[in-house]
């Protein structure tokens, strides 16, 4: 959904349409999980849809002096499901941390982050926890 935020500066209607497409049953699971990225749609990603929807709303209001509050409110149910799915996941070590959800600058790694490394070690990714902390602000 981050791509829709970038699009909002030029075409807020299309930005909302793009964000709404990702919230349809074609992409979002019934439990609220939203798609991750094209090479693995079922990977866990933090619930960034709420942030994206709010930013699109804010950008349109700043640029056009008006915004589509109906679109924002109609997205709320799906966004709440996505947040609930993420908040209720169990981390791999059962330490009540938000596990996974890598959303780095380029989202590219030289190895498969979902599997242990050849020496058996794993990589801890703080991305999910940092995204969830944003909801407390």
Located regions from the model:
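Well-ordered alpha-helical segments within folded domains of soluble proteins
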Residues: 1-8, 15-18, 43-55, 129-137
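Active-site acid/base region of carbohydrate-active enzymes
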Residues: 9-12, 22, 27-30, 44, ...
């Amino acid at each position: 959904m981050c791509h829709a935020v970038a699009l909002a500066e030029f075409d807020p209607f299309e930005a909302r349409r793009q964000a709404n497409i990702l919230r349809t049953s074609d992409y979002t699971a019934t439990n609220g999980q939203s798609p991750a990225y094209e090479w693995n749609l079922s990977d866990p990603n933090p619930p960034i849809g709420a942030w994206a929807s709010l930013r699109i709303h804010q950008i349109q209001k700043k640029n056009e002096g008006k915004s589509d509050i109906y679109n924002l409110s109609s997205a709320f149910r799906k966004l709440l499901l996505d947040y609930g799915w993420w908040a209720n996941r169990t981390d791999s070590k059962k330490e009540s941390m938000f596990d996974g959800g890598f959303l780095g600058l380029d989202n590219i790694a030289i190895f498969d982050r979902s599997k242990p490394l050849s020496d058996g070690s794993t990589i801890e990714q703080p991305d999910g926890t940092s995204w969830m902390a944003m909801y407390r602000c």
